[in-house]
């Protein structure tokens, strides 16, 4: 009886392993998403990426709550790759020589997507006058400056040194209020957490009780955009770390004033919050593990 149980356990483990293993598709050789047929390409839960993954024929991968979870799944062989914006790939791949990404272009070799689906905007509470005020500030930032800032943030997150940021402004001497911004602080190069040693432009992270988290600093493209907006509006910036699924509820409840977290203004989200103009647009790519 014990021997039979042992055999059953072994068979079950093998079957589970097979179910959770990657496919036989060589992602590295793909030239378009059509070449990814049958591959297991994951995406983050609650994002447009989760819809885009359905464009890959025969894709059986699951969605994951965080990018770190997808990276773990990729490393373990549970998936063949995962969808990300190109800036994320620029931040992740140079720091790990086992990873690379497919340089796909939206609506040609890559995923079918509108600018609204692949662009990111700042979310605020429904009816807030912050939309117009923030849009006026964003209009001052040229496309070249936005691109150069993103490259810098990718470099910083990859451990490279940057001496001066492409986008900066003087903080107000006498702020007229506080701009509370929520983000994950875990989505390089858009936003991440520095521990103990803040990189250039990093700011303290606050907990949900309004207290500074000791030794934790937020940095990234989103942080620099938020800092620039706050400075131009004459406000003090405070960054709050939230799980992705808690970001929209935080704005709706009034716990924070806005979300700057690499968030796309999907129709579903537009029913819950108001969005500003885009502050960055990008191609969707697929990060994979080299064979």
Segments from the language model and where they lie:
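Sec-dependent signal peptide recognition
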Residues: 2-10
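C-terminal motif of bacterial Sec signal peptides marking the signal peptidase cleavage site
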Residues: 14-18
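Extended ligand-binding regions for polar small-molecule ligands
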Residues: 20, 45-47, 112-161, 225-232, ...
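Acidic, polar ligand-binding/catalytic clefts
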Residues: 22-36, 87-117, 231, 236-291
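Bacterial Sec-exported substrate-binding components of ABC uptake systems
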Residues: 25-33, 150-177
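Extracytoplasmic small-molecule ligand-binding "clamshell" domains
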Residues: 40-43, 55-56, 60-67, 72-76, ...
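Short loop/helix-cap segments at secondary-structure boundaries that form the rim of catalytic
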Residues: 51-56, 93-95
């Amino acid at each position: 009886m014990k021997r039979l149980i042992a055999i059953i356990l072994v068979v079950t483990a093998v079957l589970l392993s097979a179910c959770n293993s990657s496919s036989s598709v060589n992602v590295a050789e793909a030239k378009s998403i059509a070449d990814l047929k049958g591959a297991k390409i994951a995406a983050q839960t609650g994002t447009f990426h989760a819809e885009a993954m359905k464009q890959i024929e025969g894709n059986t991968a699951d969605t994951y709550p965080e990018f770190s979870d997808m990276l773990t799944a990729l490393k373990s062989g549970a998936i063949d790759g995962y969808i990300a914006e190109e800036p994320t790939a620029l931040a992740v791949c140079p720091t790990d020589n086992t990873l690379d990404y497919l340089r796909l272009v939206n609506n040609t070799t890559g995923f079918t997507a509108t600018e609204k689906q692949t662009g990111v905007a700042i979310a605020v509470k429904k009816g807030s006058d912050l939309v117009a005020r923030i849009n006026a500030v964003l209009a001052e930032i040229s496309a070249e400056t936005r691109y150069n800032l993103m490259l810098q943030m990718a470099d910083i997150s990859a451990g490279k040194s940057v001496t001066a940021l492409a986008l900066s402004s003087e903080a107000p001497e006498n702020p007229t209020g506080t701009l509370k911004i929520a983000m994950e602080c875990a989505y390089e190069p858009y936003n991440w957490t520095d521990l103990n040693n803040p990189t250039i432009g990093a700011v303290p992270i606050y907990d949900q009780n309004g207290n500074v988290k000791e030794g934790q600093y937020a940095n990234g493209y989103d942080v620099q955009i938020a800092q620039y907006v706050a400075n131009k509006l004459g406000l003090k910036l405070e960054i709050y770390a939230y799980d992705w699924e808690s970001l929209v509820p935080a704005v709706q409840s009034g716990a924070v004033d806005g979300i700057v977290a690499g968030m796309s203004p999907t129709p579903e989200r537009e029913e819950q919050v108001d969005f500003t103009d885009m502050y960055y647009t990008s191609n969707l790519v697929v990060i994979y593990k080299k064979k």
